A protein has these predicted regions:
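N-terminal Rossmann-like NAD(P)+-binding domain of SDR-like oxidoreductases, especially those catalyzing
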Residues: 1-186, 226
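NAD(P)-dependent short-chain dehydrogenase/reductase
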Residues: 140-142, 165-234
Length: 234
């Protein structure tokens, strides 16, 4: 999502600064390929190093972890951003069962650093990614923002609910305009290879069985990437 949003903003003339940890949750070659598409060469990237795009003169990139408070605050202090859009998080529901600390570091500590940075360096507008997973055991459909979200069924979902509460608190205390968007399974070009639709297509091409959970009784909504980006921009 961050890749498509950065391109959209750069193409409409905004000054854009992209940040990514480039972790190995999935194949980093895809991450570097996205960056190349945005004019950022892999060989130019180094941790904490600001890189200017060869394709967009209004786009820069830095490899950085959100939990690295010192470097993150240095960036926010130097750039004096009008708005921050936080789409960075440790993703995946099942992965959180085996790697819980990765979710606390990125999704809780990292997001707190974003909030505190916005407070200290006077960023007026914060948009951040929440998730449909916060609805947990809700059985009523369609889901609504008025629904109870107090019963998450994964650590990933719990961190996203926590992010919403933290953003609400900072908005109340410090006047930060914070908007959380509960994304529903985003699909489209350059998407993550661990998502179900990529796995289904890969299995079909390889003439292998498609792995289905919950005896095929599961339902899920999908949202195309262009619609997600349009919603964020608005």
């Amino acid at each position: 999502i961050g890749f498509h949003l950065a391109k959209r903003l750069a193409e409409r003339g905004d000054e854009v600064f992209g940040l990514d940890s480039i972790n190995d949750y999935y194949d980093v070659r895809l991450k570097y390929a996205r960056l190349k598409e945005a004019g950022i060469a892999e060989e130019d990237i180094g941790y904490g190093k600001y890189v200017e795009s060869s394709k967009y003169n209004n786009y820069q990139f830095v490899q950085l972890r959100l939990e690295d408070r010192g470097n993150l605050f240095n960036l926010l202090r130097a750039q004096q951003f009008d708005a921050v859009c936080n789409l960075a998080a440790q993703a995946g529901v099942r992965y959180s069962l085996e790697n819980p600390y990765a979710y606390i570091d990125s999704n809780i500590v990292g997001f707190l650093n974003i909030l505190e940075g916005c407070r200290q360096y006077h960023v007026d507008n914060l948009c951040f990614a929440s998730s449909s997973s916060v609805y947990g055991l809700n059985t009523k459909v369609p889901f609504s923002t008025k629904d109870n979200v107090d019963h998450p069924v994964s650590l990933y979902a719990a961190t996203k609910k926590a992010d919403e509460l933290m953003a609400h608190t900072y908005s109340h205390l410090y006047g930060i305009r914070a908007t959380g968007l509960r994304f529903f399974t985003v699909y489209g070009p350059w998407g993550r290879p661990d998502m179900a639709y990529y796995k289904f297509v890969k299995a079909a091409f390889e003439d292998k069985p498609i792995e289905v959970y919950n005896n095929g009784e599961m339902q899920r909504d999908f949202t195309y990437i262009d619609d997600i980006v349009e919603g964020v921009v608005r």
